[in-house]
Amino acid sequence: GKSMASLFPTLKSLPKTQVEKIFYLSAKTAGQASAEDALAQIHAQQLPIRSLTITAKRKACFNPEQPCDPNYCDYAKGYFDRLPQALEIIRDQPGHWDKARLETLAQVHQVCPFELSLDAAREVDVIVCDYNYLFSPSTRLKRFFEERRGRYSVLLDELHNLVDRGQDMFSAEVQKLQ
């Protein structure tokens, strides 16, 4: 429905607008699932579009009890040595890279699935992710939004949720130590 109504014309306009990448931002997993469903329908038409969903680090990590550090995590150790082969597969295979597909690829290449999703974001046409990846100062995708490297379209799902999310992101809380 609504996801397709925004994604399809935006994708169709890519060759004419010089837009390099589409960001589909949602506050909720359900909104991301809706975008993934719309992308599945688009991919079923054999269009050579690459897309991915960035899953939160806490949900994607293979070793959540370990620090994200090459000294503690085997998926971080040697990450950049194994990354090129994984990215080559993403470049060579149009379609949607969801959490499960990225995890499978990450396991095969023994790389961190979360970091792989961030690096793979440069290789795809559409990125489905949480609002935080654009608006939160601590999790913003700096490689896209602070380096000012390209022209992007941003589609915001359920925009009315952004107000509450923004208040949470930019509010401070002081707690008394006991």
Regions found by a protein language model. Give the residues of each.
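A substrate-engagement module of RecA-like helicase motors
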Residues: T17-I127, N132-F135
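Walker A/P-loop
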Residues: G1-F8
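Amphipathic alpha-helical interaction segments
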Residues: L14-T17, G166
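Hydrophobic residues on the short alpha-helix immediately C-terminal to a glycine-rich phosphate/catalytic loop
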Residues: P9-S13, A38
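Signature of the SF2 helicase/ATPase Hel1-core->accessory helical subdomain module
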Residues: S6, A33, D37, H109-V126, ...
